[in-house]
């Protein structure tokens, strides 16, 4: 057979292969174009958070499940050493969202800063004592060494004082109170240097895993102060003018974090996956999981705001101007309410 004949016979095969290649390349280009378009369209939200905070757990869930990509969001995280650093970042414009409390938001609003608060967690601290301790009630703390995390104007401490004063007990005067860093005080209590500690919920979970018991959870005294439920003290905080300009971003971000919370609320396997972040063994991890789940806010904003107004009065009475400034009530507009349709 001549070379010319062979060439004629091969030409259709070559043309078919070329056509297939062109189709493949076209499909690849279209897919890549769509991918790049999605990436280009993704909007960025800047978070400033504590490296060891529980928000880090949720953000890991967001990334692992692609919740940010599904919402067309790019969440840029700056890790900070303290809550105060987050406040500076927000006020300085280097962060869009931080985690703080409505008390601070209300104070900032009274000073002219238009910040808003969206509930993030209702996990509260507790008074913890060794399993062998004779302490049964807070009245038993009179004359005892009580380690209080966070300082003299810590919210849990002020709430506890307000509740106990209704029973004629002044823990600030009747107990030997020591203030300090949460983990340091937990260690001292563990070593027997303190009789009990009022500490943050995650530190309490750590102590619970060490065999300590809860004498009283702060959520247990809220009804005595007029609250109707477990109030969310911590929330996402951002500028309301920024939120108005980026309503879609805010809505999608809050939706993404709600989905992450639901995964952590329903999946024990997810807790095993993030155990490296919690830095807890299996028994301790279960305690962290259960306490975290108890603190997921599920109440309407109206209920949260009403309880915040009630608790503000207690905190203002106990903490004074150093805590709330010259404000006498929760500032209007403190709680974020999305615009309809956003």
Where are these regions (language model features)?
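Bacterial N-terminal signal peptides
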Residues: 22-34
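Boundary at the C-terminal end of the N-terminal hydrophobic targeting segment
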Residues: 36-42
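Short, glycine-/small- and polar/acidic-enriched structural segments
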Residues: 43-172, 176-179, 188-191, 195-201, ...
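Pocket-lining segment of extracytoplasmic ligand-binding domains
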Residues: 102-103, 183-275
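Small-molecule pocket liners
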Residues: 121-127, 133, 212-213, 232-236, ...
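Secondary-structure end/capping motifs
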Residues: 243-321
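Conserved C-terminal helix/tail region of periplasmic/extracytoplasmic solute-binding proteins
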Residues: 309-342
């Amino acid at each position: 057979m001549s070379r010319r004949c062979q060439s004629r016979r091969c030409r259709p095969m070559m043309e078919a292969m070329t056509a297939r290649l062109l189709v493949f390349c076209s499909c690849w280009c279209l897919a890549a174009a769509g991918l790049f378009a999605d990436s280009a369209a993704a909007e960025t939200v800047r978070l400033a958070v504590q490296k060891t905070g529980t928000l880090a757990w949720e953000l890991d869930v967001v990334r692992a499940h692609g919740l940010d990509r599904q919402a067309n969001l790019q969440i840029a995280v700056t890790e900070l050493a303290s809550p105060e650093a987050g406040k500076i970042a927000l006020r300085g414009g280097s962060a869009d969202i931080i985690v703080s409390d409505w008390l601070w938001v209300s104070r900032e609003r009274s000073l002219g800063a238009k910040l808003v608060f969206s509930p993030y967690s209702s996990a509260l601290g507790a008074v913890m004592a060794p399993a062998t301790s004779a302490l049964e009630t807070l009245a038993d703390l009179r004359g005892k060494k009580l380690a209080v995390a966070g300082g003299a104007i810590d919210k849990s401490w002020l709430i506890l004082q307000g509740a106990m004063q209704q029973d004629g007990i002044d823990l600030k005067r009747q107990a030997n109170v020591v203030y300090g860093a949460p983990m340091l005080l937990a260690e001292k209590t563990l070593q027997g240097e303190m009789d009990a500690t009022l500490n943050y919920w995650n530190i309490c979970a750590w102590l619970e895993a060490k065999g300590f018991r809860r004498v009283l959870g702060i959520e247990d005294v809220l009804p005595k102060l007029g609250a109707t439920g477990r109030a969310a003290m911590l929330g996402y905080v951002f500028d309301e003018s920024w939120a108005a300009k980026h309503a879609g971003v805010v809505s999608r971000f809050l939706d993404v974090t709600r989905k992450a919370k639901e995964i952590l609320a329903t999946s024990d396997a997810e807790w095993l996956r993030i155990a490296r972040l919690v830095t807890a063994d299996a028994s301790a991890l279960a305690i962290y999981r259960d306490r975290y789940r108890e603190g997921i806010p599920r109440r309407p904003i109206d209920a949260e705001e009403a309880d915040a107004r009630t608790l503000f009065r207690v905190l203002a009475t106990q903490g004074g101007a150093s805590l709330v400034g010259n404000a006498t009530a929760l500032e209007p507009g403190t709680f974020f309410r999305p615009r309809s349709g956003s």
